[in-house]
Design a protein with these regions (language model features):
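Fold-independent oxyanion-binding glycine-rich loops
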Residues: 3-5, 40-42, 49, 60-63, ...
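Beta-strand->loop->alpha-helix junctions that form or flank phosphate-binding loops
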Residues: 55-86, 142-145, 158, 259-262
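Residue-level detector of flexible, active-site-proximal loop/helix-junction positions
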Residues: 45, 64-66, 97, 164, ...
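Acidic-glycine-rich active-site phosphate/pyrophosphate-binding loop
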Residues: 80-107, 156
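Flexible active-site lid/hinge loop adjacent to a nucleotide/diphosphate
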Residues: 1-68
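Hydrophobic alpha-helical transmembrane segments
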Residues: 118-121
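ATP-dependent carboxylate-amine ligase
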Residues: 13, 112-115, 127-137, 141-315
């Protein structure tokens, strides 16, 4: 269990994070007696699932010195298994025995450790496979071979550099995911470079979630292209963009930097056509395949000489 964040709330009677945690805890409770339940020690909601978890408990944590703090310390004292990020390595503990599995910098999907969410994924994957007896050399080789490329993981941190522009395609469709992506963007952006973002969220999320996406986007991007999916999931056309724009503008972001477009193709093209060397474009697609093809066409053609940004009256 990686974490519990505020997504899908307001759907099917799940109104709070505590409600969602109770639903997710069914997975932990259903683990067979001889199985292993892998939990994130850094997330309070996930940590609380340990009380009712089935099978043998396995912890993972990205905190420094996690092996010497609770709940991992007492777990290891009783001979348990834990995987932690320690001294730049993925470290596996079995009781007091420590094994360095792989350097985090050697895991391509973490981008040298900059993509902290993929560090968490690597820790969780190591915990799960090590608990099942997979040799650490095999785990290290697998983590070293798996990338965040479109071929390995479509729509999950796919990166392409073209014409001096870095393009990132990632399905960050909720506030927690956008927050994590924003941390990475802050680390990768070049001095003096702009960051363009194509941003959206499914229409069946709460109004407050849509507004929060706009607030978060304003703190990450210099130019925002809000767009809507073909299926509004019960919302009228334009209403999703309106709420996200409301959030962005509430932060004091200039209205000239907030754009509302009808679809993701137009939003993608607007970002790519106006980016210049040193800029970054972050695309959050619904049609992952179609948008990736569009990005590749951008890479294969000469950059357009466009000076103005699109008008706001797109939808």
């Amino acid at each position: 269990m990686l974490n519990v964040t505020a997504d899908h709330l307001g759907l099917k009677g799940i109104d709070t994070i505590a409600d969602l945690a109770r639903v997710k805890s069914v997975v932990a409770e259903s683990v067979a007696r001889r199985g292993h339940c892998v939990l994130n020690a850094d997330d309070p909601m996930t940590r609380s699932m340990a009380r009712h978890a089935g099978g043998h408990l396995v912890w993972f944590s990205a905190r420094d010195a996690a092996a010497t703090t609770e709940p991992i310390r007492s777990h290891l004292a009783n001979g348990g298994i834990a995987v932690v990020s320690e001294a730049g390595e993925v470290a596996l503990y079995r009781g007091s025995d420590r094994t360095a599995v792989v350097a985090i910098a050697a895991i391509p999907a973490t981008l040298g450790g900059a993509a902290d969410f993929n560090v968490f994924n690597a820790l969780a994957a190591t915990a799960m496979t090590a608990a099942h007896g997979i040799p650490t050399k095999t785990i290290a080789a697998a983590l070293g071979a798996f990338t965040s490329s479109f071929e390995d993981s479509p729509g999950r941190l796919n990166i392409l550099d073209a014409h001096g522009v870095r393009v990132i395609v990632d399905y960050a469709h909720n506030p927690a995911a956008l927050t994590a992506l924003g941390r990475l963007v802050a680390k990768l952006r070049k001095t003096g470079g702009r960051v363009f973002g194509m941003v959206s969220i499914p229409g069946d999320r709460r109004d407050c979630d849509l507004i929060e996406m706009g607030v978060l986007a304003a703190g990450i991007f210099d130019q925002i292209m809000f767009r809507e999916a073909p299926d509004g999931r019960g919302r009228t056309a334009g209403s999703i963009n309106a709420l996200m724009s409301q959030g962005a503008l509430s932060t004091g972001m200039r209205s000239a930097d907030v754009h509302r477009l009808v679809d993701e193709e137009a939003a993608t093209d607007a970002c790519l056509e106006h980016a210049r060397p040193g800029d970054m474009v972050v695309l959050m697609p619904t049609d992952v395949d179609g948008i990736w093809q569009r990005v590749n066409r951008f890479a294969e053609t000469a950059p357009n000489q466009v000076t103005g940004l699109p008008e706001r009256a797109y939808g």
